[in-house]
């Protein structure tokens, strides 16, 4: 039985190692839990110390550093910085600042944002006080101060227009005029065929049979030689639009509807307004050239019978400056430039030689006139002028009429002008005549009868004091036969005549267009004078925009002709002795009923000028 008892006892006993093994398993588990708890507690203390204690200390240091940075800067600018949405740290002793307005010397850049694909980062809005508004043309203005840059303040940016606005017209040159084959006049960069010096009237070089309406292509080709062209429009003092506006309208003035006449102008404006360069000043720094009178571009209505196109009445075009051979006295967006003459020198020496020759000529005629009467125009004084020339022993007349005439030969015209002390320049079909520039090129003192023929037209190229180079006889004095032109001119002392003639000869360089394939070195030609005038105009406008002022007080566009005559410092145009010459007729006084009598008359004059072109064509 013992063995059985022993066996039962054994089964009831526990091995001495068994409780130890069980106890060891529990102790091991407890140790692991304790180590994990200690580790978590340690890292919690470490993180708390780093982010709370050290973080608060760094913020305090940054706040203490900001005043010293501000004090180190020379100027003070107040700015408002919009706050970022950030989570504040749990630091009860340091609540987040409530005031977003900070006064510092220079803007403090915000911290770099964390990239977030779900939203677009927007930097803080900074509104500066005490500082003038920034304009996109500031960089161009600053080039003037760069004394090491010979082109500083003179850069021109040229739009790269589609060829339909210029070169394509030349390829289709037979359609440029209804009566004249313009193809030969577009040769030699727009100068036309060379003139032979058979009669010794011209010099041996630089003379061409130039069409009076060829300025479009001459000017554009001359621009290609301009020394200060730039491809960076932000540097440009002005922006040139090489649109052949005169050639364009010449194609469609007769026999085409207004839609066709307006098409190219509308397309041009649409093209320009889509360009980034337009946004700089909304076109106020843009300029273009048209070798025709302004009335070809100022159609007043949508009537098919009305004359010309409406380029200069388009809102966008009103911002641009258009250079024309005759401008409107009542509008502010066009400016007169000289008609082209026959002389286009390639070198300064050619200019000097011609001037010396004009000084030494013997002039046997007191006065002369080249032209035809205007029997259809009751206000024209040409008939009286022709009569006075015929009845004078010291007057010379070169009659121009239909058919063959010496008046159509450049050598005959220039020879007469070279033989005269004074050259009579009444109005043509419109205010101006090419003849005025041909005569001054010959050293002949011009006699004008209307201020719109020169004095209010070519203010960039002619002296403001017109008495230094010309004689003015009011039209009414001739029309009412109150004056003898011969007696009036004989009253001028010989010494004064000599001074006036010298002044005219000195003006020659700025009245002619140099050969577009070259450039004069020391002399400024009509192109140079025109470009500089445009740059000056744009520069004044930009400076006025920065200063928040206007150039004139109470500007009245209908009195545009007066402003160029103001003395420096004058800001308002009042009454003028020439007001009667530019007063618009009231409705009905000129046969019109639209209240635009003066413009209507000028449009009729434009039509007549085309008839004269048919008569005076040189083929």
Curated annotation (Swiss-Prot):
Location (main, coarse): Golgi
Key word Acyltransferase present: no
Spans within the Lumenal topological domain: 55-619
UniProt keyword terms in alphabetical order: Glycoprotein, Glycosyltransferase, Golgi apparatus, Membrane, Signal-anchor, Stress response, Transferase, Transmembrane, Transmembrane helix
One Gene Ontology biological process: salicylic acid mediated signaling pathway
Phenotype for residue 290 to V: In mur3-2; altered xyloglucan, but normal endomembrane organization
Keyword Glycoprotein: yes
Name of the protein this chain belongs to: Xyloglucan galactosyltransferase MUR3
Species in which this protein is naturally found: Arabidopsis thaliana
UniProt gene name: MUR3
